[in-house]
Each structure stands twice: as C-alpha cells, then as structure tokens.
Design a protein with these regions (language model features):
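Short active-site loop/helix that positions an aromatic residue
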Residues: 103-108
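Aromatic- and glycine-enriched glycan-recognition loops and surfaces
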Residues: 42-51
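Surface-exposed amphipathic alpha-helical tracts and adjacent flexible/coil segments at the periphery
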Residues: 1-25, 29-39, 53-54, 60-88, ...
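Ser/Thr-centric signal marking residues that sit
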Residues: 115-116, 120
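Short, conserved active-site loop motifs that form the nucleotide-linked donor/cofactor pocket
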Residues: 93
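Short, glycine/polar-rich helix-capping loops at beta-to-alpha or helix-loop-helix junctions
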Residues: 121-125
Length: 609
C-alpha cells in the first residue's frame, strides 16, 4: 500500500475577503496577519474577522495560520501573550512566529511554525527548531532543490514549508537591516521601507560610473510552478504563495493556478494527496501573467541563475502583447501576439529604460487609441499590466468549492429518513415523521431533483439514492425542509469533527547550533535572551533595532552584482575593468559599499558614513 503524504497549498490573505477567496479558489491553508505584530504593519486583521475566516475555512478542512512574526519589545510581550490566547480561542490552527522570546511565555496549546524570518537555511537549524517544539519550518527562499532535499533527509519528520510564488526579498529574510538604518523602519518589526526597490548609481573605488539610475537590488518575482513535483520529491510538504499585501484578484488567480497544477500532479502521483476537502470549479482560466509580477524567476532552485533581477523597473510589467508598428495623430498600430480590450493598462520601457504607461480608450482591430498619446517609437515592445476584461471576471464570483455528499432517502416505520454522507465520511440522518401515501405519478425523478438542490451550500450531490418499497408521495415543501435540516446538521458535524491540533510546547534545553549570537540573532527582549541562555548560547548581542552595531552588514544577498555584470571570478573567470570596492549611490546621495564574499557566494551591503 502506498504511503500517502498530505500536501498543503498555502495562500496569503490581506483580509477576510482575500481569505474567503483563497478558500474558494483551492487553498489548503491560509496565512493572515494578526491584529498586531504580523510582519506587515499594513496587513493587520481584527479577531472578529479572523474568527469568521476560521469558521468558513474549517468546513473545508482548510487550516488558518496567523502571522506573529516580528521581533518584540519587552513591553509588548504581555499584550502579545493575551492576543495569542484570543487567537487560540478563535480556533486558529497555528502561529507563524519569529521571536524566540514567545517560547518563554505562558502560551496556549497552539502549534508554532518557524517563520522564514528566523533564517532557516541549514539542517542543524531546522532540527533545533523541531526539537524546540516547532511543528513546521519555513525555509529560506534562496535554497536550492538539493539543499531542500538534504534538509529533508536530515530531518525527515519535520514538515518543510517553501515559497513557490511571489515577491522576493533581495536579502536573506530576517537578515536585512537597511530599512532600519536608513529610515528607522525595521523589516523585522513589519515596517520594511522597500529599500531594495529604489534606483541607484553604481560606481567604483575611483568614482567611475559603472551603471546609472537602475534598480540594482530589485529582483523578479518567484515562480516555481513548473518545479512543483520536484519540490514535493525533495521533501516540501507546504507550498507557499507570497502576497499578504496583494489584492483579491491576485489571490484568486494565483491560488487557482497552483491548485490546478497540484491536482494534475496528484492524479499521477498517488503518494501525494491534498490536505483539505472540496472540489474547486472555476469560471475563468487562471494565468499568472495577468496578476502583478516583475517578471518571473525560479531563483536559485537549480543553483545560481543569471535571470533573477529586474533592473529597469520594480513595477509590474505584465504580459507581453506585441510591438508598435507606427504612430499616427491619435492612435498607434500594433503588431500583436494577443488582443487588447477597451480600458486596458499598457506599459513600455522608453529609450532611457524607464517604465512608461497609458490607458487604452478604445481598440479598433490593430489600432490602439490611448486616452492620452504617449511619447513612443516604432518597434517598442508593449506590455499589458492591467487587463480590463480579466479584472471584470475577477471582480465577481469566479469560483465555487463543493464537498461531495451522497444523499439517501429511505422509508422507516414512522415515515422517512434522509441520510447524508460526505467525502470525508461524516454522516448524519434526519427524520420526517409522516403517514405514507402513494403518489399518483412516478416520483423518483422529482425526488432526485429536489434533493439535489444544494446550490447555496458547501455541498454537491455526488449520488442520490432512493430506497423505497413503493412510489410514495412527499410534498415538495416538506422535502425541501428535510434537505435543509440535513445540510445544517452535516455542517454542524463537520465543524465538530474538525480537529484543531492541541500541542503544548515542551520545555527544552538542547544546544543551539552556535554558542554566540551577534545582532543577526535579532534578540530584542529579555525572554529571548532567557531562551537562548537555556539552550547554551553564552554571548548574546542585542538586536540591531535595539542597539545598532558599528560597521554592521545591512544586507546579506545571494544576488550578486559582480555576477550580474559578468565579472564573477568563479563563474565567468573574467576580471572586472573597475577597481573595487564598488558603491551603490542612492538618489539622495547615500553611499553603500559592496563586499563580495566568494567563500559563501553572497554579497554584503554596508552603509558608508
């Protein structure tokens, strides 16, 4: 018998609306921001909304994870503890956390997941976290397929969560301090200022210009939709879509796309099964290039990759549509590979490489009539970053999710019994006490029609069985009421039978992988100090946010500008024509020195005084 492993598609939710959309479009689990301390200051949610999402999702066995993944001040811990108890009582399935100080609090028996903000890159770190009580570990985005597989082999009992889609941080998560250093806004406190999306000049040690006014730290967006099966075989069990600040259209489209890809894999690979219930029926065709993206990359999944950055713009280009043939007074003609719609948003890169755009007023064959004529030249490539027709589809009901149920109507001594059994083997029965009377006309077709009317419920009839000894008559109103009571009872049983994992954190004292923590340990409060001391760490420096370290590395990047320019001594065997060190210079003339750590194959960014 094949041993089956449950695979979780984990979707983001900015708010309740996005969370419900994620359920409807195929998510097995959803992560959503806590009322406070959720690593996205702009994406907090009320306890009431979270409780409503829990109630909706659990019908489909969809799990709800709440992010509490920031580092915390001492004076915030008491409120955080209370909030966690409130989330537990609301039925939340797990918390995604960063601050080890939380493990020293009086927490309810709720599972904890180790956020990628903990910088989870090694099997030693993953094993430590699992032994400390973490039930799932979110791996660093920079890991290769081989590295993920090695971690899985070393820690086969630890569920591994990997990002498969969405925006990429150029620095290792949890190891970026540049926003705090430059703007007083800590990424580890949920207030990232998006420094990596800014434009920079790059100069050498002599002040010679290497590159001017480019977004040199801005990466493309992650897209590993073609590598899902390889990720599963490597040991990933939770596949995560980034996007807790994205709108509902993005959540619908991207979740549905990955749902379809995974379901196709599951049909062939019986050792993998989905982690929730209900079949998703879509009213649109999911297409990733219809949603926000800076272009796509599979990042470092197969080691270093030259096609990971988006130097021209940090904004969404969208889908390539064709090229400009000629420009006339109030329109331009296009040699198109796809058709445009009235109201579409179109963008292009001008002669200087800057992103420009316009809105289409109307389309006539291959003629585009912009609302305002852009300054554009023939042979310019056009992209559509807003598809009016697609967004119209996304703005209305675009999917439904139905749990299969078998309905059986049988007679009994007092009347009739309607039994309902769903795809997860939950079963209920309701009784109609009524003296039997024979019908004058055949009833079976009508009975099947009436019992199958499950439209505005989470259920869909996969089979309807009529087990009668005679052609009995039941008024349509009574049959409808019997069906309604049966559905309500089945819903109640599904909620009762849902198993919220109860897990009490163990008190542990096993050794942390290192015995000294610099500011990179992100230790912000006394409880975090206590945790690390209890696990063998002897020297503990405070978090950068608490005491900025001198000469601190502000960013640790797998993305390397020397490699991107074609001057990597390991890969290209070419000597740079410019003298190091190189510097990034921002528009307000701040300078940042680049250091290339070839031993660890990474680039470090320092602020110059």
């Amino acid at each position: 018998m094949i041993r089956q492993r449950k695979i979780e598609l984990l979707a983001p939710a900015k708010n309740l609306e996005c969370g419900i959309a994620a359920v409807d479009h195929g998510a097995d689990a959803i992560y959503i921001g806590a009322p406070r301390f959720g690593a996205r200051a702009a994406a907090g949610n009320s306890l009431e909304d979270i409780a409503e999402l829990v109630r909706y999702a659990h019908v489909y066995n969809v799990r709800i994870y709440v992010t509490v993944n920031t580092i915390l001040k001492d004076e915030e811990l008491k409120d955080t503890e209370k909030m966690i108890w409130d989330l537990y009582r609301a039925g939340v399935d797990a918390l995604i956390v960063q601050d080890m100080g939380l493990l020293e609090l009086n927490l309810p028996p709720i599972p904890l997941h180790a956020s990628t903000q903990m910088d989870n890159r090694t099997s030693q770190k993953v094993r430590f976290l699992a032994e400390a009580g973490f039930r799932q570990v979110v791996l660093a985005r920079e890991l290769s397929l081989v590295e993920i597989e090695n971690i899985h082999h070393a820690c086969p009992d630890v569920p591994l969560e990997v990002f498969v889609h969405g925006a990429l941080c150029v620095s290792y998560s949890g190891q970026c301090y540049v926003s705090q250093a430059c703007f007083g806004r800590s990424a580890n406190r949920g207030e990232c200022a998006q420094f990596c999306r800014l434009a920079f000049d790059m100069v050498d040690a002599d002040g010679k210009s290497i590159v001017r006014n480019k977004h040199l730290l801005s990466l493309k967006d992650l897209n590993q939709s073609e590598e899902l099966e390889q990720l599963l075989d490597a040991g990933a069990s939770s596949l995560k879509i980034e996007g807790r600040l994205k709108d509902v259209s993005y959540v619908k489209n991207v979740t549905a796309y990955y749902r379809q890809k995974l379901d196709t894999i599951f049909k062939r690979r019986k050792e993998y099964i989905r982690a929730s219930s209900g079949e998703v029926k879509l009213e649109f065709k999911p297409q990733l290039d219809k949603s926000f993206s800076r272009g796509f990359t599979n990042y470092f999944l197969f080691d270093r990759n030259k096609d990971i950055f988006s130097f021209d713009t940090p904004k969404s280009l969208g889908e390539e549509m064709g090229t400009v043939k000629e420009i006339r007074g109030n329109y331009l003609t296009v040699a198109g590979i796809k058709s445009f719609n009235n109201g579409d948003g179109v963008c292009f890169l001008d002669e200087t490489g800057k992103l420009q755009g316009f809105r289409i007023n109307r389309v006539e064959n291959n003629k585009l009539f912009p609302q305002e004529m852009p300054r554009i030249k023939p042979r310019t490539i056009l992209y559509r970053n807003f598809d009016q027709e697609f967004e119209r589809l996304m703005s209305r009901k675009s999917a439904e999710r139905k749990i299969a149920v078998i309905l059986k109507l049988a007679e009994n001594n007092r009347g009739f019994t309607l039994s309902l059994t769903d795809e997860d083997d939950n079963s209920v029965s309701v009784v109609l006490e009524r003296e039997k009377e024979r019908a004058r006309t055949p009833q079976e077709d009508n009975l099947r029609t009436q019992l199958g009317k499950l439209g505005n419920t989470p259920f869909e009839a996969s089979d309807i069985v009529i087990d009668w000894s005679d052609n009995w008559f039941i008024p349509a109103s009574m049959l409808a009421e019997l069906r309604r009571k049966g559905i309500e009872k089945l819903l109640e049983v599904r909620r009762i039978n849902y198993r919220q994992e109860i897990y009490k954190l163990p008190r542990t004292h096993h050794a942390f992988p290192v015995n000294e923590l610099t500011y990179l340990g992100n230790v912000m409060n006394a409880d975090a100090v206590s945790f690390y001391r209890n696990h063998g760490v002897q020297r503990i420096a405070p978090a950068y946010e608490k005491a900025p370290a001198e000469e601190a590395v502000l960013m640790f990047c797998k993305h390397c500008l020397r490699y991107s320019m074609g001057w990597c001594p390991s890969w290209h065997k070419v000597r740079s024509p410019y003298r190091e060190p190189y510097y990034l210079v921002s528009s307000d003339n701040r300078r940042f020195r680049l250091e290339f750590d070839c031993k660890n194959c990474q680039m470090k960014v320092y602020a110059e005084k």
